């Protein structure tokens, strides 16, 4: 464990609060006109997923847990969870669907991901910034419809809905941002 000042806490850090591990969801520094500056930290307890909000004085010491980020390859999903393999040691780790959250829709077999590991347990996952998916369903474009928004709804091959430009048709492969599920560009493959 490493002690750091609260103002240096960032999203994705893992904190040890009263012997329990929390992953930081957001951390904002506030400097009110009067009084001491504070850092508002929203966290999720790793053991059970409970969300907690804490306020620390910006100079207050908090314990940051030692977490190692290692590249792993996504293998498959089964009733046990999502299976990942370390390409160097061939060790396998399993993460539950709750730990992965909404990112599970973007996981593809063979995809390289970064796992945050604390004492041999995967506690967080970081996907590539972009994934390539196929459009399975989209509305036909209406000619002359330039006055309204230039994007139309589309359904991706992973079941996620997004908005795409009018020239994109069903069957087209597109690049999607994993952070928010937004359209980036047409795939170049």
UniProtKB/Swiss-Prot annotation:
GO cellular component, one term: cytoplasm
InterPro entries: Elong-fact-P_C, NA-bd_OB-fold, Rib_uL2_dom2, Transl_elong_fac_P/YeiP, Transl_elong_KOW-like, Transl_elong_P/YeiP_cen, Transl_elong_P/YeiP_CS, Transl_elongation_fac_P
Family affiliation: Belongs to the elongation factor P family.
Pfam families given in the database record: EFP, EFP_N, Elong-fact-P_C
Assigned keywords, A-Z: Cytoplasm, Elongation factor, Protein biosynthesis
Native organism taxonomy: Bacteria, Pseudomonadati, Pseudomonadota, Alphaproteobacteria, Hyphomicrobiales
Any Gene Ontology biological process: peptide biosynthetic process
Biological role stated in the UniProt entry: Involved in peptide bond synthesis. Stimulates efficient translation and peptide-bond synthesis on native or reconstituted 70S ribosomes in vitro. Probably functions indirectly by altering the affinity of the ribosome for aminoacyl-tRNA, thus increasing their reactivity as acceptors for peptidyl transferase.
Pathway(s) where this gene product acts: Protein biosynthesis; polypeptide chain elongation
Subcellular localization(s) per the UniProt record: Cytoplasm
PANTHER family: ELONGATION FACTOR P (PTHR30053), TRANSLATION ELONGATION FACTOR KOW-LIKE DOMAIN-CONTAINING PROTEIN (PTHR30053:SF14)
Single annotated GO MF: translation elongation factor activity
SUPFAM superfamilies the record matches: Nucleic acid-binding proteins (SSF50249), Translation proteins SH3-like domain (SSF50104)
Coiled-coil parts of chain: none
Gene: efp
The protein's name in its UniProt record: Elongation factor P
Signal peptide: none
């Amino acid at each position: 464990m490493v002690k750091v000042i609260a103002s240096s806490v960032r999203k994705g850090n893992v904190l040890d609060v009263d012997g329990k591990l929390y992953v930081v969801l957001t951390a904002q520094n506030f400097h009110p006109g009067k009084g001491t500056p504070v850092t508002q930290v929203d966290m999720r307890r790793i053991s059970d997923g409970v969300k907690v909000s804490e306020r620390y004085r910006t100079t207050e010491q908090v314990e940051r847990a030692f977490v190692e980020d290692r590249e792993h390859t996504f293998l498959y999903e089964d009733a046990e969870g999502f299976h990942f393999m370390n390409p160097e040691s061939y060790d396998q780790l399993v993460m539950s669907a709750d730990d992965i959250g909404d990112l599970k829709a973007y996981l593809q077999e063979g995809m390289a991901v970064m796992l945050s590991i604390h004492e041999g347990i995967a506690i967080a996952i970081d996907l590539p910034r972009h994934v390539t998916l196929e459009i399975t369903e989209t509305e036909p474009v209406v000619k002359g419809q330039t006055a309204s928004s230039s994007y139309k709804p589309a359904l991706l091959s992973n079941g996620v809905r997004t908005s795409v430009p009018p020239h994109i048709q069903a069957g087209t492969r597109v690049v999607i941002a994993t952070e928010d599920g937004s359209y980036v560009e047409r795939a170049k493959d």
